[in-house]
Amino acid sequence: MAQISDSLDVAPESFSTETPNEEAPKAPRAVLNVSGGAVGRRKQAIARVRLVPGSGSITVNGREFADYFPNKLHQQLVNDPFKVLDLLGSYDVVARISGGGPSGQAGALRLGIARALNEIDEENNRAVLKKNGFLSRDARVKERKKAGLKKARKAPQFSKR
């Protein structure tokens, strides 16, 4: 019993509360001096995207990014591929988007940016982009209206008597 109490006195000194830093600090990714382009689609929106090495400015249909997408959620959605690859502020984006609403357009722009980044440096970027689901086209589209129904699935009111 005395042996256990002696080891209890020593135990707090031998253990550290600090966890060792397992991960070495990541070196910033090298920006290739290569431009790339791609097309992204989501719902009814189509985005034609061009990436050029630069300061990180995003221009959509000739307008500033924050003006075109005032919603912070849409801005975050579009910037996700850059954040995952540690390339935020490395490429200028010039995009032309047509069709759809704000959410579909943001999704189309995100897919276009991810595909363009994949095209620029496939061997380093593809695995990370694919793992995070940025290279997958979201195939969900609006279901068509059926004859005899008010909407795609909504039936007219039914009365038994």
UniProtKB/Swiss-Prot annotation:
GO (cellular component) term, any one: small ribosomal subunit
Give GO terms: molecular function aspect only.
Answer: RNA binding; structural constituent of ribosome
Q: From the UniProt record, list the coiled-coil ranges.
A: none
Q: Which PROSITE patterns does the record match to this protein?
A: RIBOSOMAL_S9
Quote any Pfam family the record assigns.
Ribosomal_S9
Which keywords label this protein? Ribonucleoprotein, Ribosomal protein
* Keyword GTP-binding attributed: no
Which superkingdom? Answer: Bacteria
Q: Which InterPro entries is this protein grouped with?
A: Ribosomal_Su5_D2-typ_SF, Ribosomal_uS9, Ribosomal_uS9_bac/plastid, Ribosomal_uS9_CS, Ribsml_uS5_D2-typ_fold_subgr
Per the UniProt entry, what is one GO biological process?
A: translation
What is the annotated signal peptide range for this record?
none
Using the UniProt annotation, give all residue ranges assigned to the region (Disordered). Answer: 1-27, 142-161
NCBIfam families attached to this UniProt entry: PRK00132.1
Family per UniProt?
Answer: Belongs to the universal ribosomal protein uS9 family.
HAMAP family xrefs: Ribosomal_uS9_B
The protein's name: Small ribosomal subunit protein uS9
| Species this protein is from | Clavibacter michiganensis subsp. michiganensis (strain NCPPB 382)
